[in-house]
Amino acid sequence: NAAVVEDKKNGLDGHNPWNEAAKKLESETLEEYGVEKVSELPFNYSGYRMQKGEEHEAQIYKKHYDILNKIAIKQNKVYESLSFLSPFISLRFLSMDVSNTSDKLHWKFTNAAEKYRLQKQEFLNYDIKDNSKYGERGYNMTEEKFKQLPKFNFTPPTNSEIIKENTQNILFLCLWLFLPFVGLLIFSKNK
């Protein structure tokens, strides 16, 4: 997407120390700590810069992702509002929720995965920042520190949550099953 590329181009790239935003961050950090070179900082500046770049890019992707999410929500609301016209629409939404393949769950899972990815990157970048030397290559995290790496947790909705979210779909399906029988009873009595 051109808008994402443009936003990234004008911001901090944590892996490119020569772009304008990275130079500005370096200058501000040196001034804040009262030193002249990044090697004089009390931490590994590379890990710090990578984390700041990660935070900047995460904001960009979240902004554009939220735009897509809002569009998808609007589209699904229109589609769902028409579900009284056909039992297949209601059945589609209900079956997608029951099988955990709905758009809602996709967005929920993706947000949880992105939140975890950011936590993990922060953990790794700050480990480099706090425990390695500037310019050091081949740094390895300790086994003890690695055990502290955050774990990914995601809980799909329970059956009761699925039923609650699909009350309208269940109602429309029941109507689609019930109304033909009522019509059959009415018309069969008239003959």
Annotate each language-model stretch with its function.
Residues 1-191:
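Transmembrane alpha-helical segments and their membrane-interface loop/helix boundaries
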